[in-house]
Design a protein with these regions (language model features):
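Bacterial N-terminal signal peptides that target proteins for export
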Residues: 15-24
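OB-fold nucleic-acid-binding modules
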Residues: 38-103, 107-133, 137-295
Length: 295
């Protein structure tokens, strides 16, 4: 009798242990499920494009960065150097590659100035459109000139060129969503040659609007850039009849999606990025909507 009771007791203890084991396992799985749900409800914040580990805020303004490396920018030949030490700029994208007129490049500006960023990729506007605020970790990148235009990138053919896209993603952080009310997106209005002359070539790139000008070669037939040419220079006249001259021209790439559009006749406003080409100015419109008729 005692032996039977002892066996029964041991059997009951074994069953209880199994039940406790099952119960504990169930509680653990339930906890894991709750944790999983919590993680799902609280996704990782920050933009998926770029490097969210880059601290917000700049360590130097764009104008100060260009001045610091001016010996490698304002020179008679294309040169470059590597940016050393903690160096971050923060600004707003004022020109992207949406139309293809600015090819594999972006322009970033803060309240002090702007600079060209070379990236060896197309379709950058999908992630880095006009109005997107960015922080760029410049350490390890190269800064220099292309025809005296300040540019950040990496070395190509012994000059500063376009960085690979994976390098760009390591060095850029996107801040919030794109917005079009940043002051950097308000162009400087130019109505006379004197107002253009007041802008120093070292300030390029500059977002500008030429008011009430006429495209000299617009005849109702001529297009911005015929397909048999890589790019075309177009000239215009100011409202007072003054010619833009050889030191100022409208640049259009044959690869721009509006290159075969017929140039408008009459008075127009032309908004674009004023780039330096040695000691000349070239105006690069971002999209066809940057050229607006006045009549």
């Amino acid at each position: 009798m005692c032996s039977y009771q002892s066996k029964t007791k041991r059997k009951e203890e074994t069953i209880m242990k199994k039940l406790l084991s099952i119960l504990c396992t169930g509680l653990l799985l339930c906890g894991a499920g709750l944790t999983s749900c919590e993680n799902y409800d609280n996704p990782v914040t920050g933009n998926a494009y770029g490097n969210n580990s880059i601290p917000e805020g700049r360590t130097i303004s764009i104008a100060a960065l260009k001045e610091k490396y001016n010996d490698f920018i304002d020179t008679s030949k294309d040169t470059y150097t590597t940016i050393e030490g903690e160096t971050r700029i923060e600004g707003v994208i004022t020109c992207d590659d949406e139309s293809g007129n600015l090819y594999k490049k972006l322009v970033v500006a803060d309240e002090t100035g702007a600079i060209v960023i070379g990236v060896n990729a197309t379709g950058l506007y999908a992630f880095c459109p006009v109005g997107q605020k960015v922080v760029i970790d410049c350490k390890g990148l190269q800064i220099g000139s292309y025809r005296k235009q300040a540019q950040i990138g990496t070395v190509y053919n012994n000059a500063v060129g376009r960085m690979p896209e994976y390098v760009w993603k390591q060095h850029v952080r996107l801040i919030n969503e794109p917005k079009l009310y940043y002051s950097e997106l308000t162009p400087i209005e130019i109505t006379t040659p004197a107002e253009l002359a007041a802008i120093n070539l070292k300030e390029a790139p500059v977002l500008v609007t030429f008011k009430n000008v006429k495209l000299t070669e617009a005849d109702g037939i001529a297009t911005y850039a015929p397909g048999d040419e890589g790019s075309v220079k177009r000239y215009f006249t100011y409202a007072d009849g003054t010619e833009s001259g050889s030191n100022l021209f409208l640049y259009t790439s044959a690869y721009a999606n509006f290159s075969m559009e017929v140039m408008p006749q009459g008075s127009v406003n032309i908004t674009g990025i004023l780039l330096r080409y040695n000691n000349q100015w070239e105006v690069v419109v971002r999209t066809l909507s940057d050229i607006k008729r006045n009549n």
